[in-house]
């Protein structure tokens, strides 16, 4: 694991990450309010394409996207999941917080195989 700065996140006890596999995403809720989601696709080789980071307008620019990605990445790390980031926010996040680079798959993308 690469070291680097640690992302600051919201520490509210009412924040909850909910897996929503039917919609291919992880949802962030605060009490009963929907904050946003991280859209994902599980690929043939078991890696996860992280495609979209969306936060409701009312919660924008308050650090919720960073909190959402951090929560999901911490869960992926615990589960041994590798990612293939295509979301531009996630690509920027990985540049700012290289301690999560170990999650990035180092095998060829199965979608690019003939």
Report each predicted region and the residues it spans.
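Conserved acyl-CoA
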Residues: 67-82
């Amino acid at each position: 694991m690469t070291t680097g700065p640690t992302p600051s996140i919201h520490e509210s006890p009412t924040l909850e990450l909910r897996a929503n596999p039917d919609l291919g995403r992880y949802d962030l809720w605060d009490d009963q309010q929907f904050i946003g989601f991280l859209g994902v696709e599980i690929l043939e080789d078991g890696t996860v394409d992280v495609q979209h980071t969306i936060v409701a307008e009312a919660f924008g620019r308050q650090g919720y996207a960073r909190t959402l990605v951090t929560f999901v990445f911490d869960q992926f790390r615990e589960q041994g999941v590798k990612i293939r980031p295509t979301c531009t926010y996630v690509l920027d996040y990985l540049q700012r917080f290289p301690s999560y680079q170990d999650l990035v798959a180092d095998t060829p993308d199965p979608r690019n195989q003939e």
